[in-house]
DNA sequence: ATTATTTGACCTAG
DNA sequence: CTAGGTCAAATAAT
């Protein structure tokens, strides 16, 4: 049996794959002129495979979803949902495609990209759903645990002020989701150092980590050190309107570069599958503020 | 029932 | 050996 948590988690993976695909497209696009045919082929292969995988995965998810909710009206709508999501996620990319492939007012380019994949949903490809979904089964119990190497790329240190508002001043909140995995007393520091890693480390090897250390002299300030940039595309939405920086950078030293996407994939999954209980609310098709 | 945090053990570079 | 970083089992939170 599948829980809904599981499914929306799977949805996250699908969205991540799509993001990755789009990234590949962009990178190909920017280096298109000076690309030798061989490497062009390689790039295209990779892109096709990425989207194809996402397509397969999405098909399975929809099969599951449809079989679990006796209702059946999702299919025609999915395309527009995908479009809507893409517009939210990558307006820039959409625009590019409109210009290039002569779309009209609606998002033709991207629509075309996805139509092929999503139409296939109707084709009722009977697949072994269970096999692919519950893959993470038993493995060799004694893996000689690989140890971390030294120096994992860039490093960025930021000083942030603790929140003055009332209570515990501990969690400075950037726009990523972190999972604490350790805490250590540091020699010569009055306060412990906390270790976090990206929550979506599982969504294939997102290496992002951070350390949070309260300053000795100024307990109202934290030193946050970031290591590795996110390869997951699941930043929590920094909505343009809600510019409430709960975290105030005082100063920063940067040696790296990171990409931020506008909307969390997690939220995408919620749009499509809802975050609530099982089999409820088929209105997930429309935006939250839909009048109806 | 799943996901997150806590915390001592464990690991590795120096 | 020590110090800092990470793992993972127990525990808490949702």
Swiss-Prot record:
SUPFAM superfamilies: WRKY DNA-binding domain. The gene is WRKY55. Transcription factor. Interacts specifically with the W box (5'-(T)TGAC[CT]-3'), a frequently occurring elicitor-responsive cis-acting element. Residues 167-235 bind DNA. Keywords: DNA-binding, Nucleus, Transcription, Transcription regulation. It comes from the Eukaryota. It is found in: Nucleus. Gene3D superfamilies: WRKY domain. Belongs to the WRKY group III family. Residues 133-155 are annotated as: Disordered. Its main location: nucleus. GO terms for molecular function: DNA-binding transcription factor activity; sequence-specific DNA binding; transcription cis-regulatory region binding. This is WRKY transcription factor 55. One of its GO terms (cellular component) is nucleus. GO terms for biological process: regulation of gene expression.
């Amino acid at each position: 049996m599948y829980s809904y948590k599981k499914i929306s988690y799977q949805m996250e993976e699908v969205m991540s794959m799509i993001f990755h695909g789009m990234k590949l497209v962009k990178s190909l696009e920017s280096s298109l002129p000076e690309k030798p045919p061989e490497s062009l082929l390689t790039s295209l292969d990779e892109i096709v495979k990425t989207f194809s995988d996402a397509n397969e995965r999405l098909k399975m998810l929809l099969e599951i979803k449809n079989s679990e909710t006796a209702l059946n009206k999702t299919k025609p709508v999915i395309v527009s949902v995908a479009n809507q999501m893409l517009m939210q996620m990558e307006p820039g990319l959409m625009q590019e495609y409109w210009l290039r492939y002569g779309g009209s007012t609606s998002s033709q380019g991207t629509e075309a990209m996805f139509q092929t994949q999503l139409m296939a949903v109707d084709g009722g490809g009977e697949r072994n759903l269970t096999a692919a979904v519950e893959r993470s089964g038993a493995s060799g119990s004694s893996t000689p645990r690989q140890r971390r190497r030294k120096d994992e790329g860039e490093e960025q240190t930021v000083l942030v002020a603790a929140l003055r508002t009332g209570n515990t001043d501990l969690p400075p909140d950037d726009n990523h989701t972190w999972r604490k995995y350790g805490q250590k007393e540091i020699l010569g520091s009055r306060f412990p150092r906390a270790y976090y890693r990206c929550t979506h480390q599982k969504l294939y090897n997102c290496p992002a980590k951070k350390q949070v250390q309260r300053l000795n002299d100024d307990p109202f300030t934290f030193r946050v050190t970031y290591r590795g940039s996110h390869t997951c595309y699941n930043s929590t939405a920094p909505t343009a309107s809600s510019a409430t920086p709960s975290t105030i950078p005082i100063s920063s030293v940067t040696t790296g570069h990171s990409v931020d996407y506008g909307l969390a994939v997690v939220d995408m999954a919620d749009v499509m599958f809802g975050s609530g209980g099982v089999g409820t609310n088929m209105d997930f098709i429309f935006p939250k503020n839909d009048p109806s």
